[in-house]
Amino acid sequence: MRIFKLFLLSFILITPVKANTIYNLIKIPNLEIYELKTPNNLKYFYAEKPFVLGIQKNISCTNSDKQTYDEKHQIISKNLNRYSKQFLKKINLKYIVMCENLSISGINTAGIPDHLMKTLIIDLKFNEKYFERVIHHELFHVIYDGFKELFNEDEWKKFNDKNFKYADC
């Protein structure tokens, strides 16, 4: 009987830990594991339910369906497998979160990189035509955000035509 009580107690204590482990790692609620063992050591998660996050609770994303997760995961992993695990470790990227309708303050966005949390959130339906390009674009935001001291804005601007002006946001 004592062994049974110990087993029951350990089961009760361990079960909630697994459910909260993902949240404790990357501070995004309602995620489930999609794939953990990848050639480049990236860990893939998907939104099981919609989530809201951020200091101002202004970042939101919704869950998708299994078919979309499966199709888009194939594309995302094919593209990110181009990068070695050493490179991804150096730029501090470890987690990929898949969801739909990703927005910041109500404005839709293709992805949100967070180099501090080692995470890239990708909207699976933001732009079908340029989806693969978006993956690399967001990856380079991870690089830029993590190594700003290496990027000289004035040098970058010199590549533009002298009459070029960025549009107002």
Regions found by a protein language model. Name each.
Residues 1-20:
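Classical Sec-dependent N-terminal signal peptides that target proteins to the secretory pathway
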Residues 21-56, 60:
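N-terminal low-complexity, Pro/Thr/Ser-rich intrinsically disordered segments
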Residues 51-118, 125-128:
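Auxiliary, metal-adjacent structural segments of Zn-dependent hydrolase domains
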Residues 119-122, 142-144:
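Structural recognition of the beta-strand scaffold that forms the well-ordered cores
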Residues 127-144:
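Short alpha-helix carrying the canonical HExxH Zn2+-binding catalytic motif
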Residues 139-156:
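Catalytic Zn2+-binding segment of zinc metalloproteases
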Residues 158-169:
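Metalloprotease/metallohydrolase-associated module, dominated by Zn2+-dependent proteases
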